[in-house]
C-alpha cells in the first residue's frame, strides 16, 4: 500500500485508509467464502491466499457476491445446542419465531411438578406468559420498558411445567425481542443480581490484579490478563490476539495447559478473521462455541414476516461451516472469545471531555481474548458476562498504555529532531545528518537510508545501489511529480518497475523531497524478516496439507502475503519525516525575509506585555484568595518551613498565623501523616504535583480536645519568574465532618435515613443501591447537584439507567468512565476497601460536574452486605476558583514555553541565512582582515546555537543537563576577539574604550575545553562591565596563566581573567542575583550572570567581584588542559 503525502491531518488520513482497507478486505473475505462453499473438499486455502496476493487489485464495492456474503453472515437461521431461542412481538408478547428444541426444553412436563392443567403448547402465536411462572414472566415483561434491555441480563425464569430454572438473555433485533434461554445447572447457584453486579464478584480477583499493575508494559499487561482468564474459565489455551495496522493478526500473549503446541508469535492473514466477523464482535462482545462437532438447531419463523430475524446479537448463533472446520483441524472443540474494544485514536480523548456523552467517539477492535478447549465446554452466562467485564477493564488499560507509548514516542522523536536540527544549523548541509551521529536512520525505524543531494548519493546500511537510487528518483519525478513525499510498504504494489531487482531486502520506502532534485530515502525489508515463529519448531518430515486450514498453514499463508511487503509506515513516523523535511527546506533556503523578523519582534513584545500583566493579575488574585478563602490554604518554602497559613487554617486548627509561620510542616501534622506529607512535599519540589491527598493536622489551644483536622489536599508547586520551584502551596478541603458522617454510616447505627435526607449543607450528596443494583437512595443534596428528583431515579438500575456512557439520567464522559464506576461500586459490594476516585458526569442541564466519589458497603445487623452507599465530594467555590487561577497560571507558563519554542525555530532560519551568506563570502576574494571578521561571525554563531539548545531544557540548575561542556581544542585569541566584538557597538555608543592587556603568548595559546561556553561567559561579564561604566570610561581585560604538570606531555592550565571597569560598579542587588539561585526578583542580567557563574564552576572555577575607589573588577577563574601545539609553531 502506498500513498503520497496529503494535506489532511494524521487522524483523517488514518480513517480514510482504514475505510478503504476494510472495503478491500471484505471483498477478499467474500471471494474466499464463495470459493470455500463451491469447492468443498478441494478447497486449497494456501494457494487461494497466494493467488489473491499475486492477482490484480480487488474492485472495492458492493458487488452481488459481497452483499450475499454479508447477508449470509448476519442472517443465519441456525443456533447451537446449549440453549433455545424465542423471538417475541414486543406489543403482544407472542412468539413469532422459535428454535426447534424450544418446545422440548421449555414445555416438557416434569413428574416432580404436579399439574392439573394441560401443559402449554409452544408454537407461533403462543403468549410467553403461559410458559413461565408469574415472577419470571413479569421480569421478562419489565425488560420491555428499558431502552437497553440487556441491562437486566440474565433474568432468572422458571418453567411452569417442569419447574426448571433458566437464564433468559434478552436483546432487541429488528422488529422483535430475541430471548436466549440457557438452563441453570443443578450444581450452579443461580445468579440473582443484575448484570455487572454478579459478574464483578466472579471477576473481582482478576480485575484487582490488572488494576494493581504499574503500567508501562503492554507485554506484562497482556500476559497478566491471559493468566487471569485461564484461571477464571478453565480452558486449555488462552491467547491475547492483537490486530495490526494492516488488519493481520498476531498471538501476542499465550498460556496453555502442559503438552499443547504453543502459538505464541504466530501471525495470521487478515482473511483468517473476516471483516464481517469483526463487525459482529463490535456488537456482541462475547462469543462462545460449545462443541464444533454438534449438529446445529434450525429456527422456525412465522410465515409472511415483514422482516428477517437477525441472530447477530444472540449468544446461541451457530458458527459457519468454514470456522467449524478450522476449529476441528486445530483440535479446538470449544472456544470462548472476548472482544477488546478501544478508542480509535488518541486525539478523540481530548475532544470528548468537552462534549456530552451522547456524541460518542469512534471505537476500534484492538484484538481478541481467545480461549480454546480440546473437548466440549459450556460456560454459564454469568461467568461469560464476567469475562466481558474483565475484557472491558483490560481495554481501559490498553488505552492507557497507548497514551503512555504515544508520550514516550513523541518525546523520543522530538529529541531526535532537535539533535538533527542542531546538526543542520551548525553546518547548513544535509550531509551532516547522514554522515554524523545520530543520523536520519535514528529518526524512524528502518533498515537503510540514502540521500540524493547535488546529483550524488550517500547510502546507509541496507540501501539500494547508487544507480538504483537514481532510478527510483527518476520514477518518483515521472509518476509522483506533484507530491512532496511518498510512503509505501511495497514498491512492487506501488508500481515501481524495478522492485523485483531490489529483492526481498528492500520492499518498503518512505521519501522526503527537499526540492525537485534533492531527496532523502528510508528503506525497510520485507515483513517476514521481522517475524519470528514463537512456538515449537516445525518437524521437517511433517508435510502440511495446503487444503487443511490450520494455524501453522495460516502462518505460512501470512508469510506469502507479506513476502514483498515491509512493515507499514505509521502516521507518526510520516509526521516526523515531514517535520525534518520542513527543517531541511528552511535551513537550505537563503536568508529569511525582513517580514519574518518584524513578526518575531512584534510577537516577543506582545508576549512580554501580556505575560507581565497576566502574571501580576494572577499573583494579586492568588494572595487575595489565600487570605479570604473559606478553605484552609497553607504554604511552605523549599525547606518545608511554613510561610503561608490563612485564617481558615488557623480557625480549624486553633494555631494562630503568627505561631504557624516559620515552623516546619512535619511538626504540625499527626505522626501517622508524616510519611504522606514528606512524599507529597518531595514530589512537589521536583515539580510533580499530587492531588486529592489526605492527611491529618494537629489541633492547638482551644481546639486541642477536638481531635485532628482531616484535610484532602491538592499540592501546587510555587515557582519564581524563571520557573524554578521555590516552595509548595497546599489548597485543602476540610473533610472532618464528612468523615464523621461516613463513619456513622459504616457502623450502621441509628436511623441513617434521618442523616441522608437532612437538608444541612454539611451533608454531602449521597446515593445508593441495593445488592441487586437498583437505586435505593438519593438525598436532597444529590437532587440539588444533578437536577434529578428522588422519585425520578429510585428503583432504576444505578449502572445503566442512572449512570451510563449514553442514554442515562446522568451521562458519563465515555465508556471508560462507566467501567471505572462499575469497578468502584462493585468493589464495595464485594466487601473490598475502596479509595476516593475522580468522577464526572453531566447533570440534567448538560453541565459537566467534576468531583470525587467514595463507595462504602451497607451492612445489616448480621454483617451481611445489603447494598452500597456512595458519597460525592464537590470542591467549594473558593477551591474551584483557586484551581482556575492555578490553571490560568499554568496556561501562562505554557504560552511562554510555546513562545520560546517559536522563537528558537524562528531565530534559526535567519541564522541559517547568515551562515549561508558567510560561506558564500568565503568563496570570494577576501583579504586576511576580512577573513578574520568572517571567522568572528562563525564563533558568535556557534555561541547562539549553544544558547538556543539550552532553551530545550526544562530548567537551568547546577545539575541540569543543559549546562554541559564539550571538550575541543581552541585558541584564546578566537574566544577573546568574538566576546569583545559583542560589546563593541554598545562601547561606541557610550564612548567607552576597551583595552586588552593580554600577552601574545596568551592569545596564541592552544588549549582543550569548551571555547564556546568560555566565550559566552566572557561576553556576559563584558556586557555588564560596559553597561555600568560611565560615558567615556574604559574597560580593561588582563589575564594570568599557571601551568601544572600532570604527566610528561599534559598540563593543566589555571586561567584567571580580570575585567576592570570604571564607575560606581555593579549594583549590589544584581550581584546578589548572581550568587542566589532562588532570588524571586531575578532580572535578565542577573540570570545571565548566574548561568555564567555555574558554567565557571563546571570548569572547576568561580567568579569574584572586587570594588575599589572608582574601579570595580570581575575575577574569573577556570581550569583547562593545554594542547600539545600552539598556533604558529
Curated annotation (Swiss-Prot):
Q: Please, which domain of life does this record's source organism belong to? A: Eukaryota
UniProt-recorded Gene Ontology molecular function terms:
phosphorelay sensor kinase activity; photoreceptor activity; protein homodimerization activity
What is known about its processing and modification?
Answer: Contains one covalently linked phytochromobilin chromophore.
GAF domain segment(s): 217-402
> Is the keyword Heme in the record?
no
Binding residues for phytochromobilin: 322
Q: Name one Pfam family in it.
A: PHY
- A GO BP entry: red, far-red light phototransduction
Q: Which residues are in the Histidine kinase domain?
A: 902-1122
Bias-annotated ranges (Low complexity): 1-21
The record ties this protein, via NCBIfam families, to: sensory_box
Its family? Belongs to the phytochrome family.
The task this protein performs is described as: Regulatory photoreceptor which exists in two forms that are reversibly interconvertible by light: the Pr form that absorbs maximally in the red region of the spectrum and the Pfr form that absorbs maximally in the far-red region. Photoconversion of Pr to Pfr induces an array of morphogenic responses, whereas reconversion of Pfr to Pr cancels the induction of those responses. Pfr controls the expression of a number of nuclear genes including those encoding the small subunit of ribulose-bisphosphate carboxylase, chlorophyll A/B binding protein, protochlorophyllide reductase, rRNA, etc.
Name it: Phytochrome A type 4
